[in-house]
């Protein structure tokens, strides 16, 4: 009897376990199908519950601390190469004879560029996420001074006499000019939108500053990106040259004679329905040229070919003899070599009308492209040796520097910077994000529309059932892992759905990512994309008087007349901390005649100041316009009773909102404080 009871208990226990397992298996299959939007994804628990860990022991075990070389500079004698290791917050020093790293200097957060004085004894490094420069003594390898800059310092250049230092402030769209004798900022000039690079002309008479984002433009018009020209003598902006139908002008260079100034650029076709991708009607890539003669003609030429695109051109350098230009294409892991004499001949024989035609001509590059040189993953900054014989290439996602012989146009060496040898899942995802290999003929990658994993400020006319409807304003990808759903219409409940089959159908026009690649891409998006610190509007967390008043407006429950505001129409209902989104759908009265009836997912507000334009279709150029132009009926929060000063204060508060981590630990206390203030 006891034996039978034991058998019964054993089999009963097994039956219960089996039933539990069967039910759990059914649930897990349903869960995976829901997350991925496919029926056969071999997703396992590790994909979502290990690879996407941001903090803790698991995150430390599965991730690595990579270097990610970004920009380069050479000592005047060419014996030492200085490498900005962006992810390591370090400046690496490489012996160019032995091709070994010989020193490492800790610098500030998110370093961008380095420049070396002609005596080879002093360097300056821009720390983009710290709003300062480090002055470094290259003998002692010590930081000897810190200079406060504008917001987001990027490229730094010396005036030809080295008396002044020009700093491109990328986030505040300015150029800071420092007197190097007094170490003080003496001027700050307005540049284009999101400037990143600058270069002096060979005669030292002027500097040009490139920009990445379009200027504010009338709604529904093509992008217009500024190249700012600064007069060196007066240190004033003397001209603002506008490149139409172009953006992401990352870097620029002058020929030694000064006859040409050349910038990298991308020509987006964002206003055309994306139904002719094979003809380049999505993105084309090339260069912008300004002639010193011919009344300063401005020309755009492509580096693409009819059946192959060379996406995301980043840096450009020109040989000392002025015969060749080298361009790094970070989206396809290629260096393009251009014959500048062929460029000159083409310009000399062509009218402006003909050159305008060439700006969209995919075949014209055959005339001036000499060679394509493959590199490691994600080539970024370039620098030529003083004699022009060697080109150094920062392979950002390889943690290496490629060395190319500029005479044979072959890679002759690879400098290992001693980064981790293991490629993590998230690192592979970052490579995929920055590579165009999954789109039709390599025409664009995730980075193209999401530079710095953010957004490009453009509105796209994506292919759909009805052409020209449901225009989409590009959304940021920063810190979005915890705030589904995705897309403005909230159709995708997970990043797997967002970047899976639906993504390939609408955007890439090729096979969808395989399962391992999709796992990797999701891991990177969830764990590897952070918000920059909001040093411009909220550097310490202590709000200004105007921001405090705006905070009260944001959390108010009654109008100025004392009338209670319905809960569903209070700002904080749809935009509660820490992400300032409730992740729910809402109608805010902003549908246009070209939109299908739909609700919209409440967007996050972290670092909202750097995400213009606003609304689902980008129709609001500024935060103010959300209420001054697009809220007549108080459907997007009650605002029509507000005084102008109150609106100004509200906007100031919105600009102060920073990363969600500052609000996560005290959401309830945060709400309680607001209720008490009200």
What are these regions (language model features)?
Residues 42, 88, 130, 172-174, ...:
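A detector of repeated loop/turn-to-beta-strand junctions in beta-rich toroidal repeat architectures
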Residues 62-65, 104-108, 146-150, 188-191, ...:
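Surface loop/turn motifs at the tips and blade-to-blade linkers of beta-strand repeat domains
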Residues 66, 71, 209, 214, ...:
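Periplasmic c-type cytochrome electron-transfer domains
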Residues 4-5, 19-75, 88, 284, ...:
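Short sequence/structural segments immediately N-terminal
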Residues 95-99, 137-141, 179-183, 231-235, ...:
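Short loop/turn segments that connect beta-strands within beta-propeller blades
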Residues 76-77, 118-120, 160-161, 202-203, ...:
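Residue-level detector of Asp-centered blade-edge/turn motifs that repeat once per structural unit
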